[in-house]
Each structure stands twice: as C-alpha cells, then as structure tokens.
Amino acid sequence: MADNKPYKSYFLDPLWNNNQPLIAILGICSALAVTTTVKTAITMGLAVSFVTGCSSFFVSLLRKITPDSVRMITQLIIISLFVIVIDQFLKAFFFNISKTLSVFVGLIITNCIVMGRAESLARNVPPIPAFLDGLASGLGYGWVLVFVSIIREFFGFGTLLGLQLIPKCFYASEAHPDGYENFGLMVLAPSAFFLLGIMIWVVNILRSKKAKR
C-alpha cells in the first residue's frame, strides 16, 4: 500500500467515500441497540473511534516485529486492551450511560470495523496514517449512528438529548384523545435497520450519479 498518500486522505476517506457502515456495510449490528437515543449513539461512536484509532496505531507500530502466525491474535489482544480502557472509563465517569449501553461497550471487540481497519490497512502503513484512518473510521461509524438516533429519539420519544422538543400539551390525553402520539415503531430495534437501509440506498444513488458525471 502506498505510503505517500496524503494524511488528509487517510482521515477524510473513511468519513464518506469509504464509510464503513454505508459503503462496506460493517458495524451495523450495534445500531439496533445503541441508536434509541442520541446520547448513547454519541457515546458509542466516540468509544469506537478511540478503540479503532488507538488499536490501529499500535498494530501498525508493532507490524514489523509481529510474526504472521500470531498476527490476528496480537491484534485482538491490542483491541481488547483499549476496549477494557474505554469500558472502565465510562463506568468511572459516565456510569448511567455505561449502564444503558450495558454489554455493548465490551462487544466493541467484535465490531468488524475495528478488526477490519487493523487487518486491511494498519498492518500495511506507518502508525500516523493508521491512527488517522482508524479514528476517522470510528467517526464515520459514529455520525451514521447519531443520524439514525436523531430520527429514532425524536419520533419515538419526542426528545433530543433528553430535552422535550414536542410540547406535552400536544400529546393525547383524556381531555384531548386525538392529540399527538409518539411513533412507537421507532423505539423498536428493526426501525434502525430500516433507517440504515434507506441511508445506504440514498448514498448509493448519490455515488452512482457522481460516477456518471
């Protein structure tokens, strides 16, 4: 892999052109659990960015002294180290969010994006480009989660970041039975897959139109 690629490209490409959930269709399973609210989506996006960036950096740093026979085991050990760090950090300083995310922080180690960037790029390039790519891959994953969570939280709960945006007086009550009701489907896990599917469809249309120009 060419090492003379500009650092800017390593950071910008994963945000859109090589966005892992939208282009490579990786890391979408966690969208079921962590996109019901914007807070959890932001937290998971930042956690994955930290783990992917740091693990890619150290995989690259150790690439020349890591025997090929234990390459993937070494990568998993590095990834699990940073997953433990972020998990303990959230439990220490953001306990409520950590409790909401439950086991899904620990399951970052199974996220295909983290291992994918380590295996496909980090072991082939110097540490700085590897870190930029890993960080941006996590951020690219994160903004997709946040976009989905904004729609789900607003229509499912009438809130954003826990703030009530739809006035309580608009909701149905005994006095006004025909008032507004939250869109219950958005609270259910399958809605995340529907929204991701629509996003992937729109992105493919935009990419195909751009390719024809």
From Swiss-Prot:
GO BP terms in the entry: sodium ion transport
Compartment(s) of residence: Cell inner membrane
Catalytic activity: a ubiquinone + n Na(+)(in) + NADH + H(+) = a ubiquinol + n Na(+)(out) + NAD(+)
Entry EC number(s): 7.2.1.1
Top-level taxon of the source organism: Bacteria
InterPro entries the record matches: NqrD (IPR011292), NqrDE/RnfAE (IPR003667)
Bilayer topology term: Multi-pass membrane protein
GO CC terms of this entry: plasma membrane
Signal sequence extent: none
TM region positions: 21-41, 42-62, 77-97, 101-121, 131-151, 183-203
Sorted UniProt keywords: Cell inner membrane, Cell membrane, Ion transport, Membrane, NAD, Sodium, Sodium transport, Translocase, Transmembrane, Transmembrane helix, Transport, Ubiquinone
Main enzyme class: translocase
Molecular functions per Gene Ontology: oxidoreductase activity, acting on NAD(P)H, quinone or similar compound as acceptor
Record has Cell division as a keyword: no
Subunit structure: Composed of six subunits; NqrA, NqrB, NqrC, NqrD, NqrE and NqrF.
Family, per entry: Belongs to the NqrDE/RnfAE family.
NCBIfam families linked to this entry: nqrD, PRK09292.1, PRK12405.1
Chain's role: NQR complex catalyzes the reduction of ubiquinone-1 to ubiquinol by two successive reactions, coupled with the transport of Na(+) ions from the cytoplasm to the periplasm. NqrA to NqrE are probably involved in the second step, the conversion of ubisemiquinone to ubiquinol.
Protein name: Na(+)-translocating NADH-quinone reductase subunit D
Organism name: Chlamydia felis (strain Fe/C-56) (Chlamydophila felis)
Name of the encoding gene: nqrD
